Amino acid sequence: SLLRTRSIVASSKESVETTETAALEIQSASVQVNPDRSSAQISKKQLSSALRAWGRGDERFIPSFVGSKIIKESNDEIVKEILHYGKSSLPDGSPNLQRTTFRGDNLMITEYLAGPWFMAIAGIEEKQDGELCFLLTTVRHKQHPDYVSPSAAAKKAGADKPPPTTEQNARRVLGIIRGLVEEGQL
């Protein structure tokens, strides 16, 4: 049976893990929110507000190759139509539906409702010493008949580079949050 796990611990506060089985690819990153005192400090409340904005599809958080439109919304759940590179990832060309659920003030779970199964979990991780980490985990089902790897999908769409890894995306989103905090927008 195929099971590959690769763990990287960047510091005692951060970790990156990738696990692959024949059917699943799981990437997880836990990135320290306030690694030093020289940059704007981000509070748990600001992180929570940012998770909500990201989950709603706020364009400041969404990569340029993703298009999203809210079609249903309640306090704890949002359903959006999603296009990648201006196109559907589904064989019939219809927009993929994405459901985002909020669990309390520190966890956001997003999954695609058709086509190859994909789930992302973003959240706030509190360490025993009070430090905050931004957590992002992605799970892809590779054995779905319509599955295409993210890099192959980007190449097919004509993108000049592959989409970010889970760790790169976590750091990208955290950088956006820090910028919004510095500008007083969170």
Walk through the language-model features, giving the residues of each:
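N-terminal mitochondrial targeting presequence
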Residues: S1-I8
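Residue-level recognition of well-ordered beta-strand positions that form the cores
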Residues: S30-Q32, L83, T138-R140
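Short, highly charged C-terminal tails/helix-capping segments
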Residues: S68, R171-L186
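Intrinsic-disorder/low-complexity, polar/charged segments enriched in Ser/Thr/Lys/Arg/Asp/Glu/Gln
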Residues: L24-S28, E77, F134
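Intrinsically disordered, low-complexity coil segments
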Residues: E17-E20, N34-S38, G86-G104, E126-L132, ...
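Glycine-rich portal/gate segments that line the openings of hydrophobic small-molecule binding cavities
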Residues: I70-P116
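Hydrophobic ligand-binding cavity/cleft-lining segments
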Residues: S12-K72
